[in-house]
Amino acid sequence: MAIIIGSDEAGKRLKEVIKSYLLDNKYDVVDVTEGQEVDFVDATLAVAKDVQSQEGNLGIVIDAFGTGSFMVATKIKGMIAAEVSDERSGYMTRGHNNSRMITMGSEIVGDTLAKNVVKGFVEGKYDGGRHQIRVDMLNKMC
C-alpha cells in the first residue's frame, strides 16, 4: 500500500508536514506534485490516477479549503472521497464508506489536527457488511 499525496500551492506547506509524518511512521509515500506548481484540479487528478492504479493505495490532497479537490475527486469514476477536517471523520470514512481519498484545507486544519486526521484515515479499515450497500450505490452513480 502506498499513500499518494499532492497539493496545490495553498496546500504545499501542510502537504510537507503530512508527508514527513507519514515517512516518520514508515509509510510508502508518493508525492505526485513534488517540485511542481499545479492547480488543485491537476493535483487531484494526479493523486486519483495513482490511487486507482493499485488496490490498497490511498490518496490525500490538500488545497486551501479542501472543497475544490473534493469536487474533482467525486467526478472520477470509481473514486469515493471525503473532505475531512476532524479525526473521527478521517477514520469513519474508511470504515463506513471505503473512501480511498481524503481532501483537507490548509486554511481549515492545523498541523497537529491534520496529522491526526491522516492517522485515522490510513489506519482505518473498511467494515464492509451493511456499508457495502451504500458503497455499491455510490459506485453505480458514476
UniProtKB/Swiss-Prot annotation:
Keywords: Isomerase, Lactose metabolism. Pathway: Carbohydrate metabolism; D-galactose 6-phosphate degradation; D-tagatose 6-phosphate from D-galactose 6-phosphate: step 1/1. One of its GO terms (molecular function) is galactose-6-phosphate isomerase activity. It catalyses: aldehydo-D-galactose 6-phosphate = keto-D-tagatose 6-phosphate. Transmembrane segments: none annotated. It is an enzyme of class 5 (isomerase). InterPro entries: LacA, RpiB_LacA_LacB, RpiB_LacA_LacB_sf. The keyword Ubl conjugation does not apply. GO terms for biological process: D-allose catabolic process; galactose catabolic process; lactose catabolic process via tagatose-6-phosphate; pentose-phosphate shunt, non-oxidative branch. Belongs to the LacAB/RpiB family. This is Galactose-6-phosphate isomerase subunit LacA.
